[in-house]
């Protein structure tokens, strides 16, 4: 439950303050000041990355992201008791590949219905088409980022350990039909 996250955060802060926890030692963002109670903080960011399911195995990636680990807990259960979020809530979807989750469409719809995020971004390889994602793009309630990493199938296969560049490009064309400004395409350059 979300209350467990708050308790863990309290413990971490207490440990930092009394010197028994050094996980944040040396961090430039660590500041000494009077802070509001954690319970009074607004939740402004949710990053959905509780799995490592992926339909590719990119040469620059690690098995942390493509290792095939199913979600270890229910996000719907986690957010069950959470009703208040900040007005500037942003949701980021990653993983692994978010769209290969069996529950992606339902989870995407339920989190959007419950929280009405101000912005959200789905980091997808676009190898699998999602009607729910298409509808969110068409209604301008999400954006996507896709790393293509190649211009031809041979290079795509070498970098991604997967065929499907044409399929990815077709899906990106469909996704961008109504709101091309919400689609970011990037390339990651490697020495290979």
Where are these regions (language model features)?
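N-terminal pre-core extensions flanking Radical SAM catalytic domains
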Residues: 1-68, 83-85
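Short amphipathic alpha-helix with an adjacent loop that forms part of the alpha/beta core around
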Residues: 78-84, 134-137
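Generic structural signal for well-ordered alpha-helices
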Residues: 105-108, 134, 169-173
